[in-house]
Amino acid sequence: MMDPLKVLEKQSGFLRLLVYLSDKKEKALTEILDETDIPVHQLYSSIEKAKELNLIKTRTDSRKYPPRNLVSLTAKGKRFSKKLEELIRILEKD
């Protein structure tokens, strides 16, 4: 049987990304890197995983130079991140 804490540790960048985006409308990748402690390689793999699960969407804003890569939660991602925040609150209670 897999240890749930080990699974969470491996997915910590993924989970932190979703919690971080939960109260944001849309964020640039550079802002996410500046405002979180998620390592760059972990951030990119977390974004790909979350996109595959339809939890986030990405787009490029070309109106500014240099173009900015933007990330936001999908409706499914918002529901997921709210549940995740509930679970975190349960863990923090004791």
Residue ranges and their predicted role:
Residues 1-16:
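Short alpha-helical segments that sit at the start of domains
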Residues 64-78:
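Intrinsically disordered, low-complexity basic tails/linkers immediately adjacent to helix-turn-helix/homeobox/MYB/SANT
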Residues 17-24:
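Short amphipathic alpha-helical elements of helix-turn-helix/winged-helix folds
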Residues 75, 79-94:
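Amphipathic alpha-helical dimerization/coiled-coil segments
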Residues 53-67:
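Beta-hairpin "wing" of winged helix-turn-helix
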Residues 38-52:
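Short amphipathic alpha-helical interaction segments
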Residues 24-27, 77-79:
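Short, charged/polar surface micro-motifs in flexible loops or helix N-caps
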Residues 26-35:
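Short acidic, hydrophobic short linear motifs in intrinsically disordered regions
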